[in-house]
């Protein structure tokens, strides 16, 4: 699960740019 945290953060940052 810990390995997916940075992935989720990067996805959220990508959505923020939209």
UniProtKB/Swiss-Prot annotation:
Domain of life: Eukaryota
Listed GO biological process terms: innate immune response
Main location: secreted
Coiled-coil positions: none
GO cellular component terms, A-Z: extracellular region
Localization per record: Secreted
Keywords linked to the UniProt accession: Amidation, Amphibian defense peptide, Antimicrobial, Immunity, Innate immunity, Secreted
Function, as annotated: Antimicrobial peptide with very low activity against Leishmania species (L.amazonensis and L.infantum). Shows low cytotoxicity against mammalian cells in models of peritoneal macrophages.
Family per similarity comment: Belongs to the frog skin active peptide (FSAP) family. Medusin subfamily.
Protein name per the record: Medusin-N1
């Amino acid at each position: 699960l810990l390995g997916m945290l940075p992935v989720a953060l990067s996805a959220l940052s990508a959505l923020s740019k939209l």
